[in-house]
């Protein structure tokens, strides 16, 4: 069957397309072309993708099926399907930006596309590749045990007082944490050094090449409680009946459990130099899709307030600066976005290349 194609996917095949340039763009023409194509499969690591796909289908009359799949499984599937010529996933939303940049894009297995009509609203740093949404991972405390966050400086987490009392996912199994370490070194090492001086009243003296490496080594040496999930970390901090004074580093999405009475999480604020970091999700069109226009239309939809709304409920932040979080989002992170370290994909390949080094630093420094 002949397939109407507004713009062949091959035209988009620059490995890193860069921020969208001003160009003629006709959304109505894209919709019409998408409606003439086969349906699409869209994959994300959150179950909210099911709701997004259903709403997209109703809005545009283009069939879309959403599937939840972990980032590692998505990466493997894209490579396998591209090599076999049997593409099943048309759009992938991967919450491991460095891996997507390191494994998929250089080989041309998947392509980043920024909707030209929305480019002016999207943070320029989030366009190469396109970061659709970001999940805040933030310092938390138990509001039943503390009137306010007991942490005022990231270096507080290295104090004997907090030995074994920080709950977080294991960096050896959660790449977003080693990426955070590398992002700090690449973009905020001076702030880490300044925070040390602010806390201890003297400049940091270290044999390590950077302040961030000194911080990570000290943090690991203080024996955080390492978990295999956000849920386990959040429970350690603020589950009902918890009497141990833990603090945690968890996803803002866990604050949903406050409303259900399962947790009593509080959001830390005014921590020097930041309260956490953003873990971003990249949106890519898979090479070989039979429905390139439908795939592009879904990317466009995901970059609108209507399209990303289901994920906004979990505190996930759109890269479209005109899109606001819901007023009733449980964590209250919208008031503190300036206090988190945003992900900068300009050093994404460096994050990818240095994961093993950061894991080695953590492994060699960790003491329980």
Please name every model-derived segment.
Residues 121-122, 134-137, 213-219, 261-287:
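Periplasmic-binding protein-like
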Residues 98-103, 238, 243-266:
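A ligand-binding cleft/hinge motif common to bilobed small-molecule-binding domains
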Residues 17-22:
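Sec/Tat signal peptide C-region and signal peptidase I cleavage site
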Residues 25, 339-368:
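Conserved C-terminal helix/tail region of periplasmic/extracytoplasmic solute-binding proteins
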Residues 26-35, 45-63:
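Short, polar/charged alpha-helical segment
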Residues 281-347:
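Mature extracytoplasmic/periplasmic domains
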Residues 43-54, 67-79, 87-238:
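Extracytoplasmic ligand-binding site segments that recognize negatively charged/polar headgroups
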Residues 1-8:
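Bacterial N-terminal signal peptides that target proteins for export
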């Amino acid at each position: 069957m002949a397939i109407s194609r507004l713009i062949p996917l091959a035209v988009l095949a620059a490995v890193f397309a860069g921020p969208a340039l001003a160009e003629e763009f006709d959304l109505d023409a894209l919709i019409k072309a998408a409606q003439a194509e086969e349906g699409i499969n869209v994959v994300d690591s959150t179950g909210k993708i099911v709701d997004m796909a259903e709403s997209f289908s109703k809005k545009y009359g283009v069939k879309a099926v959403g599937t939840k799949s972990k980032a590692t499984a998505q990466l493997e599937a894209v490579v396998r399907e591209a090599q076999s010529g049997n593409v099943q996933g048309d759009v992938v939303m991967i919450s491991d930006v460095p891996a997507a940049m390191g494994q998929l894009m250089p080989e041309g297995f998947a392509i980043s596309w920024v909707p030209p009509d929305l480019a002016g609203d999207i943070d320029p740093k989030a366009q190469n590749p396109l970061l659709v949404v970001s999940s805040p991972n933030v310092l938390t405390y138990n509001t039943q045990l503390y009137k306010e966050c007991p942490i005022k400086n990231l270096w507080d987490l290295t104090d004997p007082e907090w030995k074994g009392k920080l709950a977080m996912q294991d960096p050896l199994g959660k790449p977003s944490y080693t990426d955070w370490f590398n992002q700090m070194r690449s973009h905020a090492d001076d702030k880490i050094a300044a925070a040390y001086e602010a806390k201890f009243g003297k400049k940091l003296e270290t044999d390590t090449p950077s302040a961030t490496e000194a911080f990570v080594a000290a943090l690991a040496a203080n024996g955080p409680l390492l978990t295999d999930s956000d849920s386990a970390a959040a429970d350690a901090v603020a589950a009902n009946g918890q009497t141990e004074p833990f603090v945690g580093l968890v996803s803002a999405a866990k604050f949903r459990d406050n409303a259900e009475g399962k947790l009593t999480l509080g959001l830390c604020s005014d921590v020097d130099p930041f309260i956490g970091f953003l873990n971003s999700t990249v949106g890519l069109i898979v090479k070989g899709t039979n429905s390139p226009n439908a795939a592009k239309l879904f990317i466009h939809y995901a970059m609108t307030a209507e399209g990303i709304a289901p994920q906004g409920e979990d505190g996930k932040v759109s890269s479209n600066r005109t899109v606001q979080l819901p007023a009733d989002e449980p964590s209250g992170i919208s008031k503190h976005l300036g206090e988190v370290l945003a992900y900068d994909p300009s050093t994404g390949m460096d994050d990818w290349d240095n994961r093993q080094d950061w894991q080695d630093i953590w492994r060699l420094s960790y003491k329980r």
